């Protein structure tokens, strides 16, 4: 991809897509942002926007044929993956590949690949297609267990279950949070882990693999709350994580940045999940690295050099959540939030708030992780999300 500008089409236009769009435009690309609703965050900065049902194969093919993009960059899971494969077969470049998008959109396919085909260490797991089957599948794993829809995003539909009496409720939660048409869950043993990390893994067109320093993160109900970089892990743990990340991304192929999640349990590293795109926990790289995860994604996608990846001594992020439902979103406390040095805010531009919805993120650097986390916490706490109706 030596000639510029390029036309980039984003399939999904949330806050991560918005940063991808900005990174693409800095490289002179023409960006078309697509989503199922108008005025999504990435649409606010894109050159053009399209509203469509992206699980509709005909609608997806129509919009791609209309714009003839050089690259298609999926930013969400809920896509017509058969249409993506058909488009790739005609010569359209799907990032990282149509197969990678299909495999990672459902937890069962990526888990079967990782644990079954590739032999990566994972939590023990089983699948269930109804509440009765869930009862049978959960008991052999021991209590507690974690129940998740095979297809969801941002932790939706997840719950930790401590006894058989709670499984029917867990099934209801999973079905309410599921995306797509699949009525299936994955049930996993609950790991008594020390830390969750994301290893941002960059795969270039020639097969070269690069890694960012590991990112530690904390979640609530499966949804990211804060992250920090670098995570303190041993050389052995880092080697295990890098080996597993390289193994699975080489199998998926293509070029781009992958967010590979692991649990650290004592000296062991356990594969958790993988996203073939920038990761929400990686928002910290907007303040921590010389090239953010979004810059790295675009460089890999477009075949551009990545001479080095350097990171600050310590950096952290903390999400800013809405507490109420409504439109006409406004923010107060921004001035107070930005009084400390080496801090920044991203306010995503979402037009609708609802309790627990991620509306922004606070970023901070420090000399140590605890200092950076405390600064990010103060920055985020100062910002209040208000709705006018």
Swiss-Prot record:
Binding site for Mg(2+): 261, 273
Ligase among keywords: yes
Sorted UniProt keywords: ATP-binding, Ligase, Magnesium, Metal-binding, Nucleotide-binding, Purine biosynthesis
InterPro entries: ATP-grasp, ATP-grasp_carboxylate-amine, ATP_grasp_subdomain_1, PreATP-grasp_dom_sf, PurT, PurT/PurK_preATP-grasp, PurT_C, Rudment_hybrid_motif
Catalysed reaction equations from the record: N(1)-(5-phospho-beta-D-ribosyl)glycinamide + formate + ATP = N(2)-formyl-N(1)-(5-phospho-beta-D-ribosyl)glycinamide + ADP + phosphate + H(+)
Top enzyme class: ligase
Pfam families, sorted: ATP-grasp, PurT_C, RS_preATP-grasp-like
Gene Ontology cellular-component annotations: cytosol
Domain ATP-grasp: 112-302
EC number of this enzyme: 6.3.1.21
Pathway: Purine metabolism; IMP biosynthesis via de novo pathway; N(2)-formyl-N(1)-(5-phospho-D-ribosyl)glycinamide from N(1)-(5-phospho-D-ribosyl)glycinamide (formate route): step 1/1
Entry binding sites for N(1)-(5-phospho-beta-D-ribosyl)glycinamide: 15-16, 75, 280, 350, 357-358
Protein residues bound to ATP: 107, 148, 153-158, 188-191, 196
GO terms, biological process: 'de novo' IMP biosynthetic process
Function statement: Involved in the de novo purine biosynthesis. Catalyzes the transfer of formate to 5-phospho-ribosyl-glycinamide (GAR), producing 5-phospho-ribosyl-N-formylglycinamide (FGAR). Formate is provided by PurU via hydrolysis of 10-formyl-tetrahydrofolate.
Family: Belongs to the PurK/PurT family.
Name this protein carries in UniProt: Formate-dependent phosphoribosylglycinamide formyltransferase
Organism: Synechococcus sp. (strain CC9311)
């Amino acid at each position: 991809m030596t000639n510029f500008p390029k036309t980039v089409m984003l399939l999904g236009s949330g806050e991560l897509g918005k940063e991808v769009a900005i990174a693409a435009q800095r490289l002179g690309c023409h960006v078309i942002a697509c989503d199922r609703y108008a005025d999504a965050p990435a649409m606010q900065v894109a050159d053009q926007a399209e509203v469509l049902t992206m699980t509709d194969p005909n609608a997806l093919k129509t919009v791609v044929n209309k714009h003839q993009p050089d690259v298609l960059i999926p930013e969400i899971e809920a896509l017509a993956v058969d249409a993506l494969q058909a488009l790739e077969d005609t010569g359209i470049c799907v990032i990282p590949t149509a197969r990678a998008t299909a495999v990672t959109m459902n937890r069962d396919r990526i888990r079967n690949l990782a644990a079954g085909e590739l032999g990566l260490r994972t939590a023990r797991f089983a699948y269930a297609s109804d509440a009765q089957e869930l009862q049978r599948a959960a008991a052999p794993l021991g209590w507690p267990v974690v129940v998740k829809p095979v297809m969801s995003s941002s932790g939706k539909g997840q719950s930790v279950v401590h006894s058989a009496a709670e499984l029917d409720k867990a099934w209801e939660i999973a079905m309410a949070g599921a995306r797509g048409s699949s009525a299936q869950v994955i049930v996993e043993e609950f790991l008594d882990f020390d830390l969750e990390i994301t290893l941002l893994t960059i795969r270039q067109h020639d097969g070269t693999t690069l890694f960012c320093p590991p990112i530690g993160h904390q979640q609530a109900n499966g949804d990211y709350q804060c992250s920090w970089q670098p995570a303190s892990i041993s050389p052995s743990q880092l080697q295990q994580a890098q080996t597993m990340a390289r193994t699975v991304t080489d199998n998926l192929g293509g070029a781009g940045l992958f967010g590979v999640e692991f649990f650290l349990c004592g000296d062991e590293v356990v594969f958790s999940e993988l996203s073939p795109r920038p990761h929400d926990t990686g928002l910290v790289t907007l303040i921590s690295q010389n090239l953010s995860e979004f810059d790295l994604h675009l460089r890999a996608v477009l075949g551009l050099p990545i001479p080095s990846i350097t990171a600050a001594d310590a950096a952290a992020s903390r999400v800013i959540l809405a507490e109420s439902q409504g439109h006409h979103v406004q923010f107060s406390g921004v001035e107070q939030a930005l009084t400390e040095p080496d801090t920044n805010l991203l306010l995503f531009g979402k037009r609708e708030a609802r309790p627990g919805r991620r509306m922004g993120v606070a970023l901070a650097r420090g000399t140590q992780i605890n200092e950076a986390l405390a600064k990010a916490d103060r920055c985020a706490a100062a910002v209040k999300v208000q709705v006018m109706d």
